């Protein structure tokens, strides 16, 4: 079986995301799917999963090959169960991502893109511990707007970016950047290169601030 490049998107769908922000994220997912579908190497290797979190975390889309990937309908309500989302992605990756065996290499280490606009409303310690036990290729956390807790995101990953106003244009730029980074990684994977976090991300656009 060909090695896959798993990509997990963890998306905040709490009540504060209602209206323009959740619509922008919905459109961003369409941008991502379109960009990846136009890239032969991505079509061959990339598998996408969507995990959303509000009062609880749920996997809306299990790890799915691009040709079968359907965008879930996002709805914003409730709180921000970030800890539950971290625990869930760790559990799902344990099940869905193929490990190395003596006979064959497993999947590439997953890429994780996390987006939140607020403060976690659950205790993230258990979920963070489970998340840290997993081997990830790259983990990017995005603070959407000034209300997101950047120090919490820094405890998850060193790669933290911010959208200053969380406008539709900024979300569009964010998803274009994610698309470019996934495409770049899929090309490296296709060339047989081992992927490291340093070379899996493209330089972000001006709308996406590195913290």
Give residue spans per PLM region.
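Short, flexible, mixed-charge acidic loops at enzyme active sites
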Residues: 60-68
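Cofactor-binding loop segments of dinucleotide-utilizing enzymes, especially the Rossmann-like FAD-
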Residues: 53-55, 117, 142-146
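P/S/T/G-enriched low-complexity
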Residues: 4-5, 130-137, 143-211
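Von Willebrand factor
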Residues: 2-61, 68-108, 111-115, 138-152, 166-173, 177
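Extended, charged alpha-helical interaction scaffolds
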Residues: 108-120, 125-128
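Catalytic-core regions built around general acid/base machinery
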Residues: 32-35, 127-135
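Extracytoplasmic/secreted cell-surface and envelope-processing proteins
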Residues: 18-19, 120-125, 151, 170-172
């Amino acid at each position: 079986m060909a090695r896959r490049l798993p990509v997990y998107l963890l998306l905040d769908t709490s009540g504060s995301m209602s209206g323009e922000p959740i619509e922008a994220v919905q459109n961003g997912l369409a941008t991502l799917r379109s960009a990846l579908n136009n890239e032969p190497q991505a079509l061959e290797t990339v598998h996408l999963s969507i995990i959303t979190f509000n009062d609880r975390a749920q996997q809306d889309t299990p790890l799915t090959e691009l040709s079968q990937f359907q965008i879930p309908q996002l709805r914003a309500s409730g709180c921000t169960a970030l800890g539950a989302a971290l625990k869930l992605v760790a559990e799902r990756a344990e099940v869905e991502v193929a490990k190395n065996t003596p006979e064959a290499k497993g999947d590439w280490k997953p890429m994780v893109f996390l987006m939140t606009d607020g403060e976690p409303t659950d205790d993230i310690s258990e979920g963070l511990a489970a998340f840290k036990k997993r081997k990830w290729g790259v983990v990017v956390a995005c603070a959407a707007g000034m209300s997101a807790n950047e120090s919490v995101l820094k405890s998850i990953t060193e790669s933290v970016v911010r959208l200053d106003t969380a406008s539709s244009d900024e979300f569009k730029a964010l998803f274009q950047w994610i698309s470019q980074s996934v495409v770049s990684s899929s090309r490296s994977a296709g060339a047989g290169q081992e992927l490291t976090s340093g070379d899996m991300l493209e330089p972000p656009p001006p709308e996406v601030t590195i913290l």
